[in-house]
Amino acid sequence: MEEMGYWMGDLLEELGCEKNQEVCQELLKKCGGRCAERNALPGMGGLKEELSGVDSMEEMARIISRHTGAECVPEKDGFLLTYNREKGCDCSIVKAGYVHSPVFCSCTQGFHQKVWSTILERPVTVELVETFLRGGSCCSQKIIFTIS
């Protein structure tokens, strides 16, 4: 499997160069969305059901924290989701040492976009605030959407 690590590193290094930055980010976001479909969303039906009909950002944050274990801070236009403080990246590909490039965090962005747009049944925008691969001590994203 060491070869896989080198291969992934080479691929991300090439995709991460200036001329391919947008293409790489979009590709990684799509991969993250597919990962969410396979690995996260099947177990999140209870969260989706409990959030259904909730229109208070504060109540949404409490429910999300209870279900995910993440810090969830309500904001005017969404919430700030922070998890794994000082514990390291959740991604099994990163944990296995296959990737070290911060460009890989676009995968996380796509993952959360798929999760929260599906759970909340509305379009969301995900902004990466802090990540381990970018030198942070946690993984934090701002999930932006409008409450109908």
Model-based region annotation:
Residues 1-103, 124-126, 136, 146-148:
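N-terminal accessory segment detector
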Residues 130-142:
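Beta-rich nucleic-acid/ligand-interaction surfaces
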Residues 102-121:
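Active-site helix/loop of acyl-thioester processing domains in fatty-acid/polyketide metabolism
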